[in-house]
């Protein structure tokens, strides 16, 4: 059995086994100069693909999970058999996080939040600049590897971070925007300058996509 996923782009059959790949919605150089082509290529084809491969391997033989989306799996880890729970947490989380990440980036991104999300950010944080400062702090101070997030938690916006590939979905929180702060996401271009990478993120955030996520979550 291979993972069923609602964003399947295409399937490649090798020796009767299906490998599920994900949509990558733009060219690898589309986010330059902020996110460079080589990093995005490796990030997508190597790192993200490894999470999918490992997740499919973990789910092999678990027909009871065949109809679960990756989001359902990471949101309900206690329902996943204990023998594969850690693998699903790490690799399912990595798959869900990266899938989300690609969809909130855009070559036409940047600027200001829009719609009700803009109003909610202003109300919660006082200003867009104050929000960016809090989000940047969450990303910069995440020790080791992890993610910075703007989430909806019990109907309210919240800035948070998660370690490794943990998903906010596991905590019952719904992501609105997220930033991968693993070194593989930025080291080729920014080396150890994580704050510079975080600053570049604001040039490629798709606020229309974030507004849609917010509307679905609140």
UniProtKB/Swiss-Prot annotation:
Its cofactor is Mn(2+). Keywords: Manganese, Metal-binding, Oxidoreductase. GO terms for biological process: removal of superoxide radicals. PROSITE patterns: SOD_MN (PS00088). InterPro entries: Mn/Fe_SOD (IPR001189), Mn/Fe_SOD_BS (IPR019833), Mn/Fe_SOD_C (IPR019832), Mn/Fe_SOD_N (IPR019831), Mn/Fe_SOD_N_sf (IPR036324), SOD_C_sf (IPR036314). The keyword Repressor does not apply. It catalyses: 2 superoxide + 2 H(+) = H2O2 + O2. Gene3D superfamilies: Fe,Mn superoxide dismutase (SOD) domain (1.10.287.990), Iron/manganese superoxide dismutase, C-terminal domain (3.55.40.20). Binds 1 Mn(2+) ion per subunit. It comes from the Bacteria. GO terms for cellular component: cytoplasm. Pfam families: Sod_Fe_C (PF02777), Sod_Fe_N (PF00081). GO terms for molecular function: metal ion binding; superoxide dismutase activity. Its EC number is 1.15.1.1. The keyword Metal-binding applies. Destroys superoxide anion radicals which are normally produced within the cells and which are toxic to biological systems. Belongs to the iron/manganese superoxide dismutase family. Homodimer. This is Superoxide dismutase [Mn] 1. It comes from Bacillus cereus (strain ATCC 14579 / DSM 31 / CCUG 7414 / JCM 2152 / NBRC 15305 / NCIMB 9373 / NCTC 2599 / NRRL B-3711).
